[in-house]
Amino acid sequence: MEPRFLLMADVAEQLNVSASQVYHMVRSGELPAIKIGGRGQWRIERSKLEEYIERKYAETAEWVRTNPLVEKDDPDLS
């Protein structure tokens, strides 16, 4: 069974970003997390990470829908 909570480093690895980027997402409220222990270590619930990823897919799909690719924008299509 996979752990319910992930370390920020684990989330950074899964998203292929830096730990500082994950910290910024948490502190900005973009990615829900909890602070636990005496040293206040951050933990991200696996389900919250999955919800975040799904939300990003939806946002990207909306952006693609409202910003159609024009041939002159992509040199590979010329």
Language model: regions and residue ranges:
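Basic Lys/Arg-rich amphipathic helical interaction modules
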Residues: 1-16, 20-24, 46-78
